[in-house]
């Protein structure tokens, strides 16, 4: 197709990070406007409606200010990434394409610290392990960062050292929380 995006790494399509990534950006915008029209028809039976053109971004990558990333063991190593589309197979990633690059850096730093402190990633099959997900938010204007460790239980061995180390690397981190799930 002449509207195919040739620049996108296939890993992003396989992970579902960039569902429309196979389309050139102007075609993505047209697709989204058509989705609105189709939804109005499907939900409300409205057919005679003008839908304005979808407004695009100057740079349609590296814009998301929040990431929720699963933590799993892949080939014996603790990894962060995204699940392969329609599965629970983790695809290790360091560059998440649509996320703020600083968020990607914080996730990689946390991954490395989790490895260093030998904290166990969650294993769905065995229903065991400690760390399920990492959630990182970054203020677009303030640059402040929030980190949330999603764990299976309240106690996290050496969590104080882990927090101290990640804040040393990223002084913009202003809050660290734990979500027990």
Task: Annotate each language-model stretch with its function.
Residues 1-181:
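Accessory RNA-recognition modules of RNA-modification enzymes
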